Amino acid sequence: GSGKTSMLNLICGSISADAGKVIVNGTDITGQKEYMRHRKIGRVYQNPSAGTCPNMTVLENMAVADLKEKGYGLNRCVRKSRENAYREMLSGLGLGLEDKLETKVGSLSGGQRQVLALLMATMTPIDFLILDEHTAALDPRTAEIVMKLTDQIVREKKMTTVMVTHNLRYALEYGDRILMMHQGKIVLDKVGEEKNQLNTDEIMGIFNRISVECGN
């Protein structure tokens, strides 16, 4: 554990900070409750089942996500007037989910669930998106599909994104800035041209050198 997921949990408010501050767009949110942050932060987890409700249909899951910014009351969650909009969103993913609105999410494949979780996390306006190793539990082919769809959504929405990954190729190919952490500290921070000049061998060399210095 280098502290990557702990850092994400601090940002999202899942755990409290012992020291320091969490500042988003110049606003100190350190003391803000997790449910309040959730309205402005989208998060996709490593486990495909973590970002969706398996016993609810695709339609019901999307309806819940659609209300995230507004909050939940005692009114009907699923609005028939939004079905066509949901179907259109899903059709753009190319996975056939637009024909599965009435299907229980628990019966979908891991890749379909992860893409649905990604779409749900970005349906409403958010300050930024957090991806917590969201392709790690998928087979290589599905991981590539999910990663390309992720890049498509992030670019279309011009969305600031923090992605934790052990896939160095993904980090180099998709990231604008690369941070490497070890024992809770940032040991590498590259952006712009410095980042563009990096390759996987160099990053592995840095990692191995740090491991040796720490006695591993």
State what each model feature region is.
Residues A121-T122:
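ABC ATPase C-loop
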Residues L129-D132:
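Catalytic Walker B motif of ABC-type/P-loop ATPase nucleotide-binding domains
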Residues D28-G42, A50, Y72-N75, R79, ...:
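ABC ATPase NBD coupling module
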Residues G20-D28, K190:
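Conserved ABC transporter NBD signature motif
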Residues C12:
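Helix-to-loop junction immediately C-terminal to a conserved catalytic motif
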Residues K185-R209:
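Conserved beta-strand-loop-alpha-helix hinge in the C-terminal portion
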